[in-house]
Amino acid sequence: MNSLLLRLHDFFKHGIMCDIKIVSIENNKTISAHRLILSMYSKYFYNIFNSDFIDKNNDEIYICADYDILYIILEFMYTGNIVLTKDNIELVIQVCDYLCIDSLIKICEEYICGIIDETNCIHLLNFSDTYNLQRLREMSKWYLPKIINNNKLVVELDIDDMILIIKEIKYIACEYIVKKIILNWIVHKDERIIYTKKLMKHINDQDHYTSLSDIELYNNIRERIYDNKEHDVDISHNFIIMVGGKKIFNITAFNPLSNKKHIIDRYDDMFGCKTHFSVVYLNSILYIIGGKKRGYFTKEVLSYNIKNKLWCYEPELNYFRYDTSVCVSNGMIYSIGGKDTNGYMTNIVEFWKPEWKSWYDGQHLCYPRCYMSLVDYNNEVYTIGGLKTSITDEFNIEMIVSDDAVEKLTDHSWMKLKQFPIAKSGISSIVYNDFIYCIGGRIDTPHISIEHTNDVYIYSSRDDCWKYLSNTNVKRSFCLSCVFNNELYIIGGYNTNSVEKYNKLKNTWKRLNDIPKFEECVNEASAIYL
């Protein structure tokens, strides 16, 4: 604090030149203060002292609050400091809300967001609604999936907390799961059966519920759930999971062999439309990383459990990035390169495991790149091609060009390998029969054009050598490559919705049924569910 603030604080502590007394009604104790200081921080006091309120000229103002809480709040106005604890934080927020001290409310919200866990998140969710604390509300909701996956916690909730949870999770879990949670809660104590209709109406408002008694409705749902007549949509193996959309955030399953597709889930209310994000798949969970949300850059990482259809927030990236390249290696998710908030390419590398509380910085790339192809090969991360900036013309102007660099991450350092035969970005890479297969991609030539390609190269680490294999039927970039029943497929891409299968014996590609074009869904990213 500067000397002036120190002097004012000293006046406050000793009651010097004070012109107003704040009286705690709860304790009948008085705090002397200065109208000017109170008016600077509190809209409540400012309005009283600068309007025609009856209290304007009174020497005392009575506040229904605890004396100790009032004192540390008033002291904050003089010092800018306050000691917050788990025991006093909610009381401080309540009084600050009454006194309209926005600056301190923000500090309190930051503190309380750091003490959320499974034991208090429901209470704090209620608390956030009461005092319109949006960040606290979002943080509290992060823990709901952990609660509903823990039956011991669920069955101990009271009816009000159950209603709150159902209202929230019905947007992030399928109806089957919500019904099962309700049944498990009722079964724990027989007397809870009288709440069946009350709970079910928060899932949907179907009229037929009103004609049934609580017992009839309970038995009806129990029969469907426990006898397994109603269950999740089965997502069989060898489905492609396509994520994203221009207007609606869809999770869509598609099988190119049967040409069948269905929307597993959609989410646009809470998460908003996301673009330029990256997707990776690990242990039945899709991780949706970075990108833009409602047009703004985000560090957000979302997870979507395909089996139980639950959304969850994960620890954020350390940096705002979009169009980053991602892959899984040794149980860790890597996010490499991409673009920053200024649209410049970056060399940032971050990695994370689902059980970790934060992302960690890895060894940065040698130079900034984006649109690289990433692949896990022999438990090492390989980067192939991409875009980079380079001085290419007579005026020494930096241009964006395709790159032919190939590197692997070993012991947290990057090792340069044999260059890719052609400088490209948007290559699709996959490990198949102990080789890296690199398919298609595009060649960016400054001032000329962007050319999509259809050549296929394979790489072996044994001799660090690239070998031309064949050409696909359709030129494509940013396509999806995957293995179905030990056969290699390529699907879609930036400029096509075609599907091809590789014939290893003939070294040829056969075109199959095209991917359906979804009018409502522009596939920003894809992942394979195997």
Curated annotation (Swiss-Prot):
Domain of life, per the record? Viruses
Among PROSITE patterns, the record links this protein to: BTB
Protein name per its UniProtKB record: Protein C4
Please give the Gene3D superfamilies that the UniProt record associates with this protein.
1.25.40.420, Kelch-type beta propeller, Potassium Channel Kv1.1, Chain A
Ranges: Kelch repeats: 239-284, 285-331, 333-379, 381-434, 435-486, 487-529
Q: Which organism is it from?
A: Swinepox virus (strain Kasza)
Which classification does the entry list for the species? Viruses, Varidnaviria, Bamfordvirae, Nucleocytoviricota, Pokkesviricetes
Q: Which family does it belong to?
A: Belongs to the poxviruses Kelch family.
Does this entry carry the keyword Ubl conjugation? no
The question of whether Nucleus is a record keyword is answered with no
